Regions:
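Phosphate-binding and adjacent anionic-ligand microenvironments
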Residues: 1-154, 159-163, 170-176, 182-190
């Protein structure tokens, strides 16, 4: 699959619009803020343009309305267009798993889980070891033939959050990979 036919640079950041805003600031320092096209995160937050540095639901709604109008003139529904994109680029699905560990014992359990996950041979990247702006208590697992899982403790709640991503040649394939991925990672939590 050709995942980047228009040669757009994709910059990965940690979850949160603070980090997307940081990327815009870096572009500004280079005099290239106009090259920022679109930012998004897993929780359905979107940002187009550089004038707002946070989730912009109003702008996202206008973009969707414009897109619906554009495709309506071509007699194509947004769902039909989405299906075309899936067929061209692959079916990517995501899931956010929240694993709660209440109380003082829960906090200790969360620390233990993160320590054990850091020892896993499946670990791809430990952002706690990063020296750049991506330094955080976040772990990334890229697991061949399954997908990607990004693990972090919540900063505000007694839970571990896991962002799961699986890609398949069709929706059934993607869902099967997602199921295998979540089972594998959940076993690692015990």
């Amino acid at each position: 699959m050709n995942l980047n036919p228009v040669r757009v640079t994709v910059i990965d950041t940690l979850t949160g619009f603070k980090f997307i805003g940081d990327q815009i600031a870096i572009l500004e320092e280079k005099g290239r803020e106009d090259s920022f096209i679109f930012g998004f995160e897993e929780s359905c937050g979107y940002l187009s343009g550089t004038y707002v540095r946070d989730k912009d639901a109003v702008n996202a709604a206008v973009l969707i309305a414009d897109m619906a109008d554009y495709y309506k003139d071509k007699d194509i529904s947004l769902l039909d267009r989405l299906e075309e994109l899936y067929k061209k680029f692959g079916y990517l699905i995501s899931y956010l798993g929240n694993y709660e560990y209440p109380g003082t014992a829960g906090l200790s359990k969360m620390r233990s889980i993160m320590e054990n996950l850091r020892k896993s041979t499946l670990l791809t990247k430990d952002y706690l070891n990063e020296t750049d702006m991506l330094h955080a208590d976040v772990l990334k697992f890229d697991i061949k033939d399954f997908g990607t899982a990004i693990v972090r403790p919540s900063g505000t709640e007694p839970k571990i959050k896991i962002y799961y991503f699986a890609e398949g040649c069709d929706m059934i394939d993607a869902k099967e990979k997602m199921k295998k991925l979540t089972v594998l990672i959940e076993r690692m939590l015990n």
